[in-house]
C-alpha cells in the first residue's frame, strides 16, 4: 500500500498501450437521445419471443432479461417492434415486440428492502401524483392510499397502481428486476429523496409449481455458528461456550426440537507466516450437520484448546474465521442464519499485510448479507488490549450491523467471564426460544428486555426484532410473494413516514464473467499504479472509466480503460466521461472524485481509499466463487452468463 501511494504521489508517466479496441462496424445501433457514444439498449422480459422480421412467424424463445442493442424501431399494424442485436458492432439478432422489452440504458436496478422497519413502497401511475404528495407531506392522504393498497382495495381512480409485497423477497430465490428508467431529485420535508420511474419485472419460471404449499411452522430452523478466538488466554471463554451450548441442547431435547437449531464451531488463530507455532489459521471443529446432535457437538469440540503461545501482536485474523464460517457451512434449510464471533483482539483488515482474506469490514459484512447471515460480535474488552478497545469496537460494530435492525455487537466489560456467559446465554437462549415458539405456531412476542445491563437489553431488543423479521420471511413464503409486474410506475426511494430511512438498495446487474473481468481490470489498474505507471490524474481517470462502464454498459468492460484498451482509449481520454455519468440516478464513490479532491486529502484518507479499492478486488473474487448466489436466467447450471445484482457501494 505504501508503495502504491508513493507511486501516485510521484505521478510518473501513463501506462503504455496493451491492446487496441476492435474496429467498430459502420452498422451501429440507435443512439440514446442527446448522446454521441451511448446506444439504446433493452432487456427482454420473461416470455419474450423473437422473430426474423417484424410481424413474422416462427418465433424463438429468448432467455429472460437478455440485454440487446436497439438497431431499428418499426410500427406494423399499430404494433411497435424493435430490431435488436447482441452487440454494438452490427450483430443483428431479430425483432422483438416493444411490449416484450424494457428500457435498459444503464445497468442500475433497485431491490426492495425488507419492510421490517418502514412502510412498503407504493408504486404510482404518474410522477405528478408523487410530487404533489411529497409537496403536501400530508400523512392523512398518504395513510388512506397506503391502507387501500395494502388491503388490495385501491379504487380505479387511485394514483397508486401497486404496492411492494408484505414480506422480504430473497432475490436469490425469487429473482426480479426493477430497472430505473428516469429519476428526479425532490425533498420529503428536509430530507433529500429521489423520485424514480421504474419497471418491475419478476422472473416467472415455467417450471415453478403452480400451487405453493403452506410452510410448516415446525420446520422453521436456525443455524448458529460460533467463531471463537482460540489464541492464548481464551480457554475460559471456550469452556463457557461449551457450557452454554450444552444447556441449549438440553432445552431443545425437552421441547423435542433437536434438529431445529443446529450449532457449528470454527476456531481461528492468526497468520502462520508470522507465528507458525499457532498450528492453524482457521479450523472447522463442527459443521451444522454434525451440530444437530448435542453429544456429537460436544465430543467434537473436546479437542479445542487455546494456544499455548501468543500471536505476533494484539490483532488476529478473525475475518479468516468468519469467512470460513460463512463459506464452509451448508446453510441450506436454515431460515435463520447466525455467526457469533467471540474474540478479545482486533481483526486484521484488508490493509493488513498479514490478512489472509484481503477483506475489510464492509466487504465481509456484505458477503455475509449476500448469504443471508447475521453476524453477532461478543467483544472481550480485556485489560491487555485496552489501548485498542475504541478502534476495535468501532470495527466490530460495523461488522455486526444488520440492515434495518442495527448492530448486533456486545462489548464484554473487562472481559469478565461471568458477564460473557450471561450475554451468550441471553442471545443463544433468545434465538432458541424464537425457534420453539415458531415450532409451536405461537405468536412471536416482541418483549421489552428486563436486563439491568443497558447494553445487553439493547442487544436483546435487536435480536427480538431480527428474529421476528426472519420468521415473517419464512411464513410469507407460503404467500408466493412476488414483486408486482408493472411496466411503468413511479416511486420514492425513501420512506414517506420516515424519510431518513431508505426503502431500496441500488444494485448493478452483472454476469459472472463480467464480475471476473471487473476483478481483473481493477487489480491491473491498482498494480500499474503501484508500479508507478499511472499519474494521479490517470489513476483517477482509469477508476472513473471503469466505474462508469460498469454502471452504464458492463459488456464494454475491457474497452474503456487505457489499462486494457491502450493509451488514449479510456472514457476520460476520449471525452466521453460526462456523457456516461451525467444522468445516472446513483453513482459510486469515485465518480465525483477530482484531482483537486485527491490532492487535498491527507495521506491517511488516501490510504483508506486505496484500501477500499483493494478490498473490493477481494470481495469480487469471493463473490465469484459463491456458486449458490448466482442466478441462471435460462434455468440451466451456473455459468459465465449467470447473473447477480451487485450492491452499488461494492463497485468502484
Positions of predicted regions on the chain:
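Extracytoplasmic, non-cytosolic globular domains
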Residues: 242-249, 253, 326, 340-349, ...
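SH3/SH3-like beta-barrel superfamily modules
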Residues: 22-27, 58-99, 144, 148-189, ...
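Solvent-exposed loop/turn segments at secondary-structure junctions
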Residues: 89-91, 102-103, 230-234, 269-275, ...
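P/S/T/G-enriched low-complexity
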Residues: 366, 380-652
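Loop/turn elements at helix/coil->beta-strand transitions in domains of secreted/extracellular proteins
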Residues: 222, 258-264, 295, 306, ...
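Acidic, polar low-complexity linker/tail segments
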Residues: 171-225, 231-239, 251-254
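Von Willebrand factor
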Residues: 218-337, 339-340, 347, 378, 381, 386
Amino acid at each position: 500500500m505504501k508503495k502504491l501511494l508513493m507511486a501516485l504521489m510521484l505521478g510518473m508517466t501513463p501506462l503504455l498501450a496493451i491492446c487496441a479496441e476492435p474496429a467498430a462496424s459502420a452498422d451501429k445501433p440507435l443512439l440514446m437521445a442527446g448522446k454521441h457514444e451511448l446506444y439504446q439498449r433493452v432487456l427482454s422480459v420473461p416470455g419474450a419471443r423473437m422473430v426474423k422480421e417484424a410481424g413474422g412467424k416462427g418465433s424463438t424463445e429468448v432467455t429472460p432479461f437478455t440485454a440487446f442493442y436497439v438497431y431499428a424501431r418499426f410500427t406494423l399494424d399499430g404494433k411497435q417492434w424493435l430490431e435488436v442485436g447482441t452487440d454494438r458492432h452490427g450483430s443483428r439478432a431479430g425483432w422483438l415486440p416493444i411490449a416484450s422489452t424494457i428500457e435498459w440504458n444503464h445497468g442500475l436496478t433497485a431491490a426492495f428492502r425488507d419492510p421490517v422497519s418502514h412502510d412498503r413502497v407504493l408504486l404510482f401511475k404518474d410522477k405528478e401524483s408523487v410530487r404533489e404528495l411529497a409537496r403536501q407531506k400530508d400523512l392523512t392522504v398518504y395513510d388512506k392510499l397506503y391502507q387501500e393498497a395494502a388491503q388490495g382495495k385501491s379504487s380505479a381512480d387511485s394514483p397508486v397502481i401497486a404496492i411492494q409485497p408484505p414480506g422480504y423477497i430473497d432475490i436469490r430465490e425469487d429473482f426480479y428486476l426493477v430497472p430505473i428508467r428516469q429519476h428526479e431529485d425532490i425533498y420529503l420535508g428536509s430530507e433529500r429523496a429521489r423520485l424514480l420511474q421504474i419497471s418491475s419485472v419478476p422472473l416467472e419460471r415455467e417450471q415453478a409449481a403452480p400451487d405453493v404449499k403452506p410452510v410448516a411452522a415446525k420446520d422453521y430452523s436456525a443455524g448458529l455458528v460460533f467463531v471463537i478466538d482460540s489464541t492464548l488466554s481464551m480457554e475460559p471463554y471456550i469452556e463457557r461456550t461449551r457450557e452454554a451450548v450444552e444447556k441449549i441442547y438440553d432445552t431443545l431435547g425437552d421441547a423435542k426440537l433437536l434438529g431445529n437449531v443446529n450449532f457449528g464451531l470454527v476456531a481461528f488463530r492468526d497468520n502462520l507466516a508470522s507465528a507458525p507455532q499457532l498450528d492453524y489459521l482457521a479450523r472447522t471443529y463442527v459443521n451444522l450437520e454434525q451440530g444437530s446432535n448435542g453429544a456429537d457437538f460436544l465430543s467434537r469440540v473436546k479437542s479445542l484448546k487455546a494456544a499455548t503461545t501468543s500471536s505476533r501482536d494484539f490483532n488476529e485474523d478473525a475475518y479468516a474465521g468468519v469467512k470460513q464460517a460463512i463459506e464452509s457451512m451448508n446453510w441450506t434449510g436454515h431460515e435463520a442464519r447466525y455467526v457469533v464471533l467471540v474474540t478479545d483482539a482486533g481483526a486484521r483488515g484488508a490493509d493488513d499485510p498479514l490478512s489472509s482474506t484481503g477483506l475489510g469490514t464492509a466487504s465481509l459484512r456484505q458477503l455475509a448479507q449476500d448469504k443471508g447471515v447475521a453476524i453477532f460480535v461478543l467483544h472481550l474488552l480485556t485489560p491487555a488490549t485496552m489501548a485498542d478497545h475504541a478502534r476495535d469496537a468501532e470495527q466490530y460494530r460495523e461488522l455486526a450491523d444488520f440492515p434495518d435492525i442495527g448492530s448486533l455487537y456486545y462489548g464484554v466489560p473487562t472481559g469478565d467471564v461471568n458477564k460473557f456467559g450471561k450475554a451468550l446465554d441471553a442471545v443463544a437462549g433468545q434465538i432458541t426460544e424464537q425457534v420453539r415458539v415458531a415450532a409451536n405456531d405461537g405468536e412471536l412476542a416482541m418483549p421489552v428486555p428486563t436486563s439491568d445491563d443497558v447494553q445487553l437489553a439493547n442487544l436483546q431488543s435487536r435480536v427480538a426484532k431480527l428474529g421476528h423479521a426472519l420468521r415473517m420471511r419464512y411464513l410469507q413464503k407460503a404467500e408466493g410473494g412476488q414483486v408486482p409486474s408493472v411496466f411503468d410506475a413511479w416511486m420514492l426511494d425513501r420512506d414517506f413516514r420516515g424519510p431518513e430511512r431508505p426503502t431500496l438498495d441500488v444494485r448493478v446487474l452483472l454476469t459472472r464473467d463480467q464480475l471476473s473481468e471487473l476483478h481483473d481490470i481493477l487489480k491491473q489498474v491498482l498494480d500499474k499504479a503501484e508500479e508507478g505507471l499511472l499519474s494521479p490524474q490517470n489513476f483517477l481517470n482509469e477508476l472513473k472509466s471503469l466505474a462508469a462502464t460498469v454502471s452504464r454498459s458492463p459488456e464494454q468492460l475491457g474497452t474503456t480503460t487505457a489499462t486494457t484498451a491502450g493509451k488514449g482509449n479510456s472514457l476520460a481520454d476520449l471525452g466521453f466521461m460526462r456523457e456516461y455519468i451525467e444522468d445516472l440516478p446513483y453513482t459510486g464513490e469515485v465518480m465525483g472524485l477530482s484531482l483537486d479532491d485527491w490532492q487535498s486529502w491527507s495521506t491517511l484518507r488516501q490510504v483508506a481509499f486505496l484500501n477500499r479499492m483493494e478490498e473490493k478486488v477481494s470481495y469480487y473474487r469471493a463473490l465469484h466463487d459463491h456458486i449458490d448466489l448466482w442466478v441462471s436466467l435460462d434455468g440451466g447450471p451456473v455459468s459465465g452468463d449467470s447473473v447477480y445484482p451487485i450492491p452499488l457501494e461494492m463497485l468502484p
